[in-house]
Amino acid sequence: IIYMKISSKEDIINHFINGNKSDLYIGVENEKFIFDTKTQKRSTYIQISNILKFLQSNFGWEKVIEGNNLIGLKLNGKQVTLEPGNQIELAGAKLKNIHEVCAESFEFQDQLIKACNEFNLELLSIGYDPYTNLKDVPSNPKKRYEVMTKEMPKLGRLSLEMMYQTSGTQINLDYSDEKNFSSKFKLISYLVPISIALFANSSIKEKKFCNYL
């Protein structure tokens, strides 16, 4: 991590100016829940490991190992990673337009569905897990999540729910100058509340109605 010392307004402005790019790309990260079709419970680390091994064997992904544990995959600028509650995330490659992003997403989803079918698992593309109690979400051996699980509650009472009970989407956009940045930032500011209402809102929490639409 590179920390930037901020001592003036100009330091902040220069940080964004230094981010100007001539070649503009878009990258999308999205997470998905995996459930066991027999037990209707969230997938365990062992089950997710089987998925990763299947993807590696059948679609050319390379393993990412931490200690003795398989924690992800990589291929052509893309990465598959494990989130704290064994959500699977695709961190996409840098691409030129949303059509390429869409194709990348559907290709990985097709691979993931094939892997899930092999192990009696099911993919669920929603923003919040409405069924599983926080204490019942299976964990995995990634070291950073062990630290985060201890430290995050100090920063917010819903931090563990965010880690273990949500699946998010993150969009990374390059910008060419201040005007280009402003137009993209403005548009995203309009779209995010709508997308949250549509895709990340849940009327059910841990199998009970929670008075949200």
Where are these regions (language model features)?
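Terminal catalytic/cofactor-binding subdomain
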Residues: Y3-R157, Q165
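Loop-rich catalytic cores of soluble enzymes, especially ATP-dependent carboxylate-amine ligases
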Residues: N117, Y128-L213
